[in-house]
Amino acid sequence: MTLPGINKAVLIAGPTASGKSALALELAQKAGGAVINTDSMQVYRDLRVLTARPSLAEEAAVPHRLYGCVDAAVNYSAGHYVRDAKEVLDEVRRGGGLPIFIGGTGLYFKALTRGLSAVPPVPDEVREAVRLRLDRDGVEALHAELARRDAAAAARLNVRDRTRIARALEVIEATGRPLAEWHAETTPPLLPEGSYRALFIAPEREALYARIDARFDAMLADGALEEVARLAARGLDPLLPAMKAHGVPALIRHLRGEITREEAAMIGKADTRHYAKRQFTWFRHQLPEFDWLTPEQARGWVAFL
């Protein structure tokens, strides 16, 4: 089914708890589309509850792709995402469906529409060696090493940014080239300009923050703490993306007896609210081609189609 106002794909972005999933589901039912995850945490099968993935009933109602498809032990990157998204996009198009990309990870949307820097995969042994040095020598020592090997990257990064400092060193170790040189080389986008309609759902801030708090409480009631306990029992590297999902570090601290459940919930809520605020800023500056709509306007747009 072809709908007016839609080209070859629809992109629905927005902060967490903005009502994106319900909108995408309604659009997919109306247009015969497939909902394609564009959220870096909802790819992890270990975190269905805490990342607010679509329910089993919602996933059964229309095709959903790239949800819960990755183990928490995997350091899933934007490069992995683009590779997987291409396979799904080709599959949906072959079936005549409308691809509906939905999520809040700006880097994934940027990779889809602008292309991705051509950084080759870093071998696991290189990544492990850098992480061991990080644990042994500390982040300041690795930042000093980075300053000697890639002064531009070291000047750009905060001396306490363990993840990005390690990443910059991993790339130099694996390729012999600074990260900036790789970033200057980009692959063609999967969704070039003119091939999609892009929306950013922008709720009123205070209402959004109230929804975030209420949803975190609901996730705890639905078993988020037990979910995190199972994840913690695996003993994974705390620097892995899944281990840094909003709420995971605080709930692990609670499980260790360091803080109360109420304190963990407060931290998880605050981290999620701060992330939502950053999402507004990031999309406004990085992807200005997205049309900003209130949730009411977005629902009206879908109803009009």
Curated annotation (Swiss-Prot):
Catalyzes the transfer of a dimethylallyl group onto the adenine at position 37 in tRNAs that read codons beginning with uridine, leading to the formation of N6-(dimethylallyl)adenosine (i(6)A). It comes from Bradyrhizobium sp. (strain BTAi1 / ATCC BAA-1182). NCBIfam families: miaA (TIGR00174). Keywords: ATP-binding, Magnesium, Nucleotide-binding, Transferase, tRNA processing. Residues 39-42 are annotated as: Interaction with substrate tRNA. Gene3D superfamilies: 1.10.20.140, P-loop containing nucleotide triphosphate hydrolases (3.40.50.300). InterPro entries: Dimethylallyltransferase, IPT, P-loop_NTPase. Its EC number is 2.5.1.75. The record marks 105, 127 as: Interaction with substrate tRNA. It comes from the Bacteria. GO terms for biological process: tRNA modification. One of its GO terms (molecular function) is tRNA dimethylallyltransferase activity. The keyword tRNA processing applies. Belongs to the IPP transferase family. Its cofactor is Mg(2+). It catalyses: adenosine(37) in tRNA + dimethylallyl diphosphate = N(6)-dimethylallyladenosine(37) in tRNA + diphosphate. Disulfide bonds: none annotated. ATP binds at residues 14-21. Substrate binds at residues 16-21. Monomer. It holds the Pfam family IPPT. The keyword Nucleotide-binding applies. This is tRNA dimethylallyltransferase. It is an enzyme of class 2 (transferase).
